[in-house]
């Protein structure tokens, strides 16, 4: 879980636009963020395996 202080700090608008960093809205994780799903890899895996993300299926080959 992300630190509450860092989550609050990231919600403020930065002085420069390039300083903005994507965070997972579920857990607040700043790294391993998937733009397509708007969440981190850990939450993506959890929700995909539970079947809560439409169109995502487990692949096998």
Swiss-Prot record:
- Residues annotated as binding Zn(2+) are 24, 27, 40, 43
Q: Quick one: a GO cellular component term?
A: cytoplasm
Instruction: Report the cofactor remark.
Output: Binds 1 zinc ion per subunit.
Which co-factors does it depend on?
Zn(2+)
The reply on keyword Ligase is no
A GO term, aspect molecular function: rRNA binding
Q: Does the keyword RNA-binding apply?
A: yes
| One Pfam family of this chain | Ribosomal_S14
Q: A GO term (biological process) for this protein?
A: translation
Q: Which UniProt keywords apply?
A: Metal-binding, Ribonucleoprotein, Ribosomal protein, RNA-binding, rRNA-binding, Zinc
Q: Which InterPro entries match?
A: Ribosomal_uS14, Ribosomal_uS14_bact, Ribosomal_uS14_CS, Ribosomal_uS14_sf
Under HAMAP family, the record lists: Ribosomal_uS14_2_B
Q: Which family is annotated?
A: Belongs to the universal ribosomal protein uS14 family. Zinc-binding uS14 subfamily.
Summary of the function given for this chain in its UniProt record: Binds 16S rRNA, required for the assembly of 30S particles and may also be responsible for determining the conformation of the 16S rRNA at the A site.
Record's subunit section: Part of the 30S ribosomal subunit. Contacts proteins S3 and S10.
What PANTHER family does the entry give? 30S RIBOSOMAL PROTEIN S14 (PTHR19836), SMALL RIBOSOMAL SUBUNIT PROTEIN US14M (PTHR19836:SF19)
**Would you tell me the protein name for this molecule?**
Small ribosomal subunit protein uS14
